[in-house]
Amino acid sequence: MQANTFDVIERRKCITFFKLGKLWVFKQFFDNHELFNALLDYYNKDLYRFEFKYIGARNNALKLLEKSGFDYDLVEDLKGYVVQLPKHAKYAQILKNSVAFKEAANERIFLMKDLAAVEEALGLGAKIYEGASLF
């Protein structure tokens, strides 16, 4: 008798695109150099993120990511993705997983790259930011 088998649907990695003003941005490390090179024109090496000024360019990137096995979310309302830390707190790990970052008088404010990064930041002592959007 043959053992029962079933197809396991491989879980696709999801990338969150954020609308920041006129830009759409996301942060993701790609093992696939071919995919990274295809998106290289949109990579901001100073901020370690991909930026799209035009909807057409963003949509082309979305198609490329889908073909490469990624899902995506488009986020315009940043609520729930922004965390804050006191100015004196260690923040390197949180910064690493953020898409954008601002310093205020007594705190550092981060837009995290996805909800998993938000949860990790909360575990490291950050709190959800409830103020007006700074990004």
Feature locations, PLM:
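Accessory DNA-engaging acidic/polar modules
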Residues: 1-135
